Amino acid sequence: MASTSSLALSQALLTRAISHNGSENCVSIPAFSALKSTSPRTSGTISSRRRNASTISHSLRPLVRAAAVEAIVTSSDSSLVDKSVNTIRFLAIDAVEKAKSGHPGLPMGCAPMSHILYDEVMKYNPKNPYWFNRDRFVLSAGHGCMLQYALLHLAGYDSVREEDLKSFRQWGSKTPGHPENFETPGVEATTGPLGQGIANAVGLALAEKHLAARFNKPDNEIVDHYTYSILGDGCQMEGISNEVCSLAGHWGLGKLIAFYDDNHISIDGDTDIAFTESVDKRFEALGWHVIWVKNGNNGYDEIRAAIREAKAVTDKPTLIKVTTTIGYGSPNKANSYSVHGAALGEKEVEATRNNLGWPYEPFHVPEDVKSHWSRHTPEGAALEADWNAKFAAYEKKYPEEAAELKSIISGELPVGWEKALPTYTPDSPGDATRNLSQQCLNALAKAVPGFLGGSADLASSNMTMLKAFGNFQKATPEERNLRFGVREHGMGAICNGIALHSPGFIPYCATFFVFTDYMRAAMRISALSEAGVIYVMTHDSIGLGEDGPTHQPIEHLSSFRAMPNIMMFRPADGNETAGAYKIAVTKRKTPSVLALSRQKLPQLPGTSIESVEKGGYTISDNSTGNKPDVILIGTGSELEIAAQAAEKLREQGKSVRVVSFVCWELFDEQSDAYKESVLPSDVSARVSIEAGSTFGWGKIVGGKGKSIGIDTFGASAPAGKLYKEFGITIEAMVEAAKSLI
């Protein structure tokens, strides 16, 4: 019997089932502790083009020794396995055909390996997709998403019913054109941009390894699950996959098993036109165990043996190269790029049905297949119930560790965590906001169990080291400093995986703000997939000085303000930095970017942690009746300039309001009344100042206001000289204000 605390933990996890649109009717998930346990082969012909292409291909790339794979005995009836595999194929074919859009080739080729994974290997509870100790699966080749939807449907997930398959790629459906974790319970990560999925999988596997090292005991391995992924040639070509797989090998992520769909076909044709490297040897060099399944089309025992071998290797991740035929079973399109991203067409669908001996109507699941897969509901319930009992015993014996683990699993922050954040007064010493950020990071790491992160080889510049913890490494996975090396893109995507593993994981990652250009795709996926990663971006302007325009961000603030579901903070001092972290920690479905200075800044009068929650607020004002002569608006290092310009104008008898615009997105969320109290509509004299692009400031200052900024690239010179030459000065702001009054 699960403990009361375990029941509460179950209830806390139910919130994960609520879709991003706020509906609570998207999926029905009972509390996991309440679930009770109940207890001749069609080979198909292969296009001769596959054999010819294979011959050409292997003449150009060196043969790779296949790891030994033993024949194993399975209890599954081979004819039923064939039938189940073909069910997966035809659910994908039929859905793509009905939508007149999609990618049937990958599901047709990968159906055997995915069937064995979902039906024979993975542990999960289809009635609670968010059960903590489930195995995770990430379809990195996200265009083949009908493969995963078919699997979820057969496994009994309520999120993918027959009507959902029939509405594939349609408005409002639970089966979008690429996997979306926020739309479809059972989907772990949002994939589609190639390489992002395997990177997320590395993050998920890192999270498991970290939690296992922290919380497992000799008598109770409370954290014990695998991460599986399917990636294709396109994922392999993308640079991000090499970045993250290099780290996975370095970290020894033994519970990460990736299936490489080796079908030799890309959108433009055979991969020989652009991709002839030995993937096997590359992964061996990256520190992976490599297995080659030569017959991925129907070599079920080979696949089973490969998985068994992969699980036996505990000190490194495994790549299982599975040679498949894209569009397997299609007489005229198999092994062709034409089957990659378009419906087969009515005639070819019929020909494929005949070829594979499939007499059923579209979307039909044969009764014996349905009956076979139905066991996953009671088996999944039993798995979760067993784990609940295990957790109850763990909690009784190890209450402190259990409390920390529950916080990470549920996302419930410890009581009073925010009190750990530092506060400042105007008399506190001035400092660069990157240094003030480090104080916040270290305070949060001590107060929040799931807080961890690192930098892309710039920890000493980004100031992101957690002083109370060591480095997460192969031998010390319990530590919380992540060393990503110079791999910005991979870093961001790995952090997405960590954030998506459990609601209480709060990963941060860091580099120079300008190098977000190397990781923008991962940051966009953060926003789309509602992964609350904290991006610590230092050296946020020309204020970094002599390194010059290659390192000086200009358009970056504007670009992130334009990105949906991301908060762009530019704090001016210690209180605003702490306030930004407070919000970033609590907003678990929205990533945050903190743009931080290299140069020292003063602690300003009028700032506060609490005020940051408004996004924009008044820090000083000598006007009456909410009608200042002019409003000066600044962010970050330029808020000090706005404050000093205000003093100059006040000396000349002007009434001036100074507004900190630390986060546009939060200001947009405020009531109209609050916005009017800060930026009264009848005060058109407004001047903004920011050491970056002026793009977008028009909506803040209005048609009659002025924006001071930089709309060219920077230059190499000392910071003070740059500010003067680019006109980011007190004098420029005073003159602009006077011209409007």
Curated annotation (Swiss-Prot):
It catalyses: D-sedoheptulose 7-phosphate + D-glyceraldehyde 3-phosphate = aldehydo-D-ribose 5-phosphate + D-xylulose 5-phosphate. Its main location: plastid. GO terms for molecular function: metal ion binding; transketolase activity. Induction: Up-regulated by salt, sorbitol, and abscisic acid (ABA). The record marks H103, H340 as: Important for catalytic activity. The active site is at E488. It is found in: Plastid, Chloroplast thylakoid membrane; Plastid, Chloroplast stroma. Residues 171-190 are annotated as: Disordered. Thiamine diphosphate binds at H143, G192, P193, L194, G234, N263, H340, E488, F515. It comes from the Eukaryota. Belongs to the transketolase family. NCBIfam families: tktlase_bact. Catalyzes the reversible transfer of a two-carbon ketol group from fructose-6-phosphate or sedoheptulose-7-phosphate to glyceraldehyde-3-phosphate to yield xylulose-5-phosphate and erythrose-4-phosphate or ribose-5-phosphate, respectively. Could act as a stress sensor involved in adaptation process. This is Transketolase-2, chloroplastic. It comes from Arabidopsis thaliana (Mouse-ear cress).
